Swiss-Prot record:
It is found in: Mitochondrion inner membrane. It catalyses: a ubiquinone + NADH + 5 H(+)(in) = a ubiquinol + NAD(+) + 4 H(+)(out). Core subunit of the mitochondrial membrane respiratory chain NADH dehydrogenase (Complex I) which catalyzes electron transfer from NADH through the respiratory chain, using ubiquinone as an electron acceptor. Essential for the catalytic activity and assembly of complex I. Keywords: Electron transport, Membrane, Mitochondrion, Mitochondrion inner membrane, NAD, Respiratory chain, Translocase, Transmembrane, Transmembrane helix, Transport, Ubiquinone. This is NADH-ubiquinone oxidoreductase chain 6. Pfam families: Oxidored_q3. GO terms for cellular component: mitochondrial inner membrane; mitochondrion. InterPro entries: ComplexI_Subunit6, NADH_UbQ/plastoQ_OxRdtase_su6. It comes from the Eukaryota. Coiled coil: none annotated. Signal peptide: none annotated. It is a multi-pass membrane protein. Core subunit of respiratory chain NADH dehydrogenase (Complex I) which is composed of 45 different subunits. It comes from Gorilla gorilla gorilla.
Length: 174
């Protein structure tokens, strides 16, 4: 299980390095889609079935449309790949080398600490009492998001709406 999580994490980091070198919009969108799938697999591997499915449906469902549209608008006759130019290939290799160096440095000095502390988790408790009950963590997290983070949801929705509006206005030519 740990080995699978490690391989998924390496794939996610390699996807980010591949996106940051972005030789062509086609490959950048493809790498983001693959990284989204790998991120959903990491969430599923850690036991978050509901959240992994929601991220998969919302992120990949919405973003594949956006990536398809932007790729169609910005496609070149001969798109540049990661191995087609020395500069792009060197940037990918330097990015991967820096990630490997970071992993080795963290492993050597054991500098990973938990920086998030949940102080009021008790107010999220749904079932208290004698006996057994079965409540998954995912629905509790979704409920907490819409209860305690309602303004975050509103701001996020408004930001997405404004972003779509700006993209439509730019694509229209006004």
């Amino acid at each position: 299980m740990t080995y699978v999580l490690f391989l998924l994490s390496v794939g996610l980091v390699m996807g980010f390095v591949g996106f940051s070198s972005k030789p062509s919009p086609i490959y950048g969108g493809l790498v983001l889609i693959v990284s989204g799938v790998v991120g959903c697999a990491i969430i599923l591997n850690c036991g978050g079935g509901y959240m992994g499915l929601m991220v998969f449906l919302i992120y990949l469902g919405g973003m594949m449309v956006v990536f398809g549209y932007t790729t169609a608008m910005a496609i070149g006759e001969y798109p540049e790949a990661w191995g087609s130019g020395v500069e792009v290939l060197v940037s990918v290799l330097v990015g991967l080398a820096m990630e490997v160096g970071l992993v080795l440095w963290v492993k050597e000095y054991d500098g990973v600490v938990v920086v998030v502390n949940f102080n009021n988790v008790g107010s999220w408790m749904i079932y208290e009492g004698e006996g057994s009950g079965l409540i998954r963590e995912d629905p509790i997290g979704a409920g907490a998001l819409y209860d305690y983070g309602r303004w975050l949801v509103v701001v996020t929705g408004w930001t997405l709406f404004v972003g779509v509006y700006i993209v439509i206005e730019i694509a229209r030519g006004n």
